[in-house]
Amino acid sequence: MIKRELYMSRIRPFIGTELIKVMTGIRRCGKSVMLELIKQELTESGVSPTQFVSINFEDMSYSHLQTAQALHDEITARAAEIEGKVYLFFDEIQEVKDWEKCINSLRVSLDCDIYITDSNAKLLSGELATYLGGRYVEFVIYPFSFGEFMELYRSIAPDASIQQCFQKYLLAGGMPYLANLRYADAPSKQYLHDLFNSVQLKDIVKRNKIRDVDLLERIIAYVIANVGTTFSATSLAKFLKNEQRTVAPETILNYIRYCCEAYLFYQVKREDLQGKQILASNEKYYIADHGIREAVFGGNTQDINLILENIVYLELLRRGYEVTVGRTGDKEIDFVCDKRGEKLYVQVTYLLASEETVNREFGAYDSIRDNFPKYVVSLDEFDMSRNGIKHRNIRDFLLAEEWN
């Protein structure tokens, strides 16, 4: 079991506090493993496992706990038999109706430490904000980074070079369970295909009561085909009209929002760097795991430039950056990143194979006058840094401890 120290270092300061620890992210990205890692640390610090109460609400054994009252009664009864602080671990708690009322009551009435996971961003809106506002901390969990993937892959293929590891990562992606399948191609694709269907059905269709599943599937296919490309709801509506599907742009935006709430997609807004304002349209979208894209739709090798962008974008999120697409005049910067006032600029391209490409990628920074780090990231093996702009091979960039 990989330690996932990037996340544990953020969660650790809150272990044992009264704040509710909430872990969100796409289905099967490793949230349940985070609960096990927390239990492991608690045990190592002297907490007895008899103080743990763990419930996975996708397990039929707990199908009787589908309401807040039933769950409250169950936990109260079990807590009465435990000496000392009770540690509560609730996996996929969204399956319980009005669960936030139960959690708030347990927080108030018991000496407890609460950890919950969910696969939908709606968890932290609406009713939850009403009941738990200011009393929880959220941690978004992502599929494996390249570094995490390589650690596991080399436990299966110890002689794999860093280039071979990256080539495998490019196609397989970072879903943790693939290691159990030893990253074999056919089983891995089957697993990712079924996972995609599960996200689509359980976390999007069922949760949002979508009736027009065909429309949803067409929208998802369009967004996945256009990962990392700016488009508007109006342009997508025109595309669908050509396929004999007339749909309002507002409906399209709602469906895409549902996908983002299920962590299937991430929306990246555009920022006018000269006017210092967020632009209102033509956002970009990236997929939570590029391995899902390859398994379901294929084309990662043909769309290599966009997939490299997708990989870098997710790594920026993992490391805590807020990310926008930068526009300055007629030029675009792939990623403008901010973390507590510290900025970072990143351009991603496949290869710097021509003078035209070199001028385009490095020239995107011509009007940026600040002294924050600026990178061009590609698959090139040789350092082509110039004029204070750093060039890095994508593998080295992803594995670097910090960027400065």
Give the location of each predicted region.
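Hydrophobic anchor at the beta1->P-loop junction of P-loop NTPases
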Residues: 23
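Conserved lysine of the Walker
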Residues: 31
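Hydrophobic positions on the alpha1 helix immediately C-terminal to the Walker A/P-loop
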Residues: 34, 38
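Short glycine-rich substrate-engagement loop in P-loop NTPases that contacts/grips substrate
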Residues: 54-84
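Interdomain motor-coupling "hinge/lid" segment immediately C-terminal to the ATP-binding subdomain
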Residues: 119-121, 126-230, 263
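Accessory nucleic acid-recognition modules appended to NTPase machines
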Residues: 183-343
